[in-house]
Amino acid sequence: MVDKLTHLKQLEAESIHIIREVAAEFDNPVMLYSIGKDSAVMLHLARKAFFPGKLPFPVMHVDTQWKFQEMYKFRDRMVEELGLDLITHVNPDGVAQGINPFTHGSAKHTDIMKTEGLKQALDKHGFDAAFGGARRDEEKSRAKERVYSFRDSKHRWDPKNQRPELWNVYNGKVNKGESIRVFPLSNWTELDIWQYIYLEGIPIVPLYFAAEREVIEKNGTLIMIDDERILEHLSDEEKARIVKKKVRFRTLGCYPLTGAVESEAESLTDIIQEMLLTRTSERQGRVIDHDGAGSMEDKKRQGYF
């Protein structure tokens, strides 16, 4: 029967199976919602998994307060339209210290507002499993991570201490204080994601589509002028270099740390065609991935998703 399914239907069935397994095995799961395309697909799959009922777990957004404005608008619209049980968490310590990506740099901003914020939220609500939309094709440390990614009581990941996963059998045993991060989209590619969004009609943030936007090039990365805060950290010479270009985003994060790409792709079919021809990683525009050799693995060892 499986052999008669299309490639995307096989991926869909695998992801739904994983989501249902976690809901059945764990006492208090949560689905992380970063508002991006992978989160949109994962949320769609979860709703399919339990249709016509509601999700048996909440969704949670760890807010750095530096997401694109269109992302916040989209999040609020989805919560209202889908009736989601949304938890938002902002690291109060980071807010008190005034942490931001300009003054403190990408590494410290990510550690305090994302990693520590996530760990705070998981501890506060006692979640023992957290769904995430990471895929193995994104980045080398994610490529070697299991679907069930076990974390110790400090939320740390040890890549040398992973359990075997045979076929579709997952070992969900955890000791008190431990938890897992689970990745239902592990075996999907960026192209799979876009084709599935097209076929299923899944809503996504408009920033994924090419449009004329104000940007400034910093260290080879096109940074979008999303709100007034960025202007406070630009010199007069830099402000003079702000230009309008037709750009879109292949990945979405904190806007000062996420680069746009020049593109003509204004529709889903345009994006799919672009994906068939591209030879660069979607995360080439993520500044945090360039903090140092092995930076993503180091972040994950400390509790980053």
UniProtKB/Swiss-Prot annotation:
It is an enzyme of class 2 (transferase). It catalyses: sulfate + ATP + H(+) = adenosine 5'-phosphosulfate + diphosphate. InterPro entries: PAPS_reduct_dom (IPR002500), Rossmann-like_a/b/a_fold (IPR014729), SO4_adenylTrfase_ssu (IPR011784), Sulfate_adenylyltrnsfr_sub2 (IPR050128). The keyword Nuclease does not apply. Its EC number is 2.7.7.4. Pfam families: PAPS_reduct. GO terms for biological process: hydrogen sulfide biosynthetic process; sulfate assimilation. The keyword Nucleotidyltransferase applies. Pathway: Sulfur metabolism; hydrogen sulfide biosynthesis; sulfite from sulfate: step 1/3. Keywords: ATP-binding, Nucleotide-binding, Nucleotidyltransferase, Transferase. It comes from the Bacteria. Heterodimer composed of CysD, the smaller subunit, and CysN. Belongs to the PAPS reductase family. CysD subfamily. This is Sulfate adenylyltransferase subunit 2. It comes from Pseudomonas fluorescens (strain ATCC BAA-477 / NRRL B-23932 / Pf-5). The lineage of its organism: Bacteria, Pseudomonadati, Pseudomonadota, Gammaproteobacteria, Pseudomonadales.
